[in-house]
Curated annotation (Swiss-Prot):
Gene responsible for this protein: def
Gene3D superfamilies recorded: Peptide deformylase (3.90.45.10)
Biological processes per GO annotation: co-translational protein modification; translation
Catalytic activity: N-terminal N-formyl-L-methionyl-[peptide] + H2O = N-terminal L-methionyl-[peptide] + formate
Name the UniProt record assigns to this protein: Peptide deformylase
HAMAP family in alphabetical order: Pep_deformylase
Pfam families hit by this protein: Pep_deformylase (PF01327)
An example molecular function term from Gene Ontology annotations: metal ion binding
């Protein structure tokens, strides 16, 4: 396994729309393993392949406290089951050090393939539902900062650009 470099906002590669995985093979399973290692090391609770500059529709998530519930979503698709919105303070490994309140549907259905290529379906609520939507945004070239005001987004961009110019990670 290997740690992968995580792209940081405003890197334009984060805006790339990921392509579907055509076959779940050893290279995809290796990517999944590397993504989990990277996510746990960061530390984070979710990581999309786009964030590590691999533009395939692959997401890894583990919202457990003890890293005991790893979930893999390959070619995920979501359906909103309840239009009622939930508010969560979201952060992102690609927008380090910033957290903002984002509204998202609180109950969804997700269909995807697992690490072995088997189809599955979940109906998560709460934090897991929010995390899945956040990571799927990455696969579609979106970031959580796209859900906040242009002023706040501009402020975050400016602070991160200054940090990058100073060579701080």
């Amino acid at each position: 396994m290997a740690l992968l470099p995580i792209l940081e906002f405003p890197d334009p590669r984060l805006r790339t729309v990921a392509k579907p995985v055509t076959q779940v093979d050893d290279s995809i399973r290796q990517l999944v393993d590397d993504m989990f290692e990277t996510m746990y090391d960061a530390p984070g609770i979710g990581l999309a392949a786009t964030q590590v500059n691999v533009h395939k529709r692959v997401v890894v998530i583990d919202v457990s406290e003890d890293k005991s519930q790893p979930l893999v979503f390959i070619n995920p698709e979501i359906e909103v089951l309840d239009e009622e919105l939930s508010q969560y303070d979201e952060g992102c490994l690609s927008v380090p050090g910033f957290y903002e309140t984002v509204e998202r549907p609180g109950h969804i259905r997700v269909k995807a393939l697992d690490r072995a290529g088997n189809a599955f379906e979940l109906q998560p609520q709460g934090l897991l539902a929010v995390c899945i939507q956040h990571e799927l945004d990455h696969l579609n070239g979106k970031l959580f900062v796209d859900h906040i005001s242009p002023f706040k987004r501009s402020r975050i961009r400016s602070k991160l650009e200054k940090k990058h110019k100073a060579g701080v990670r």
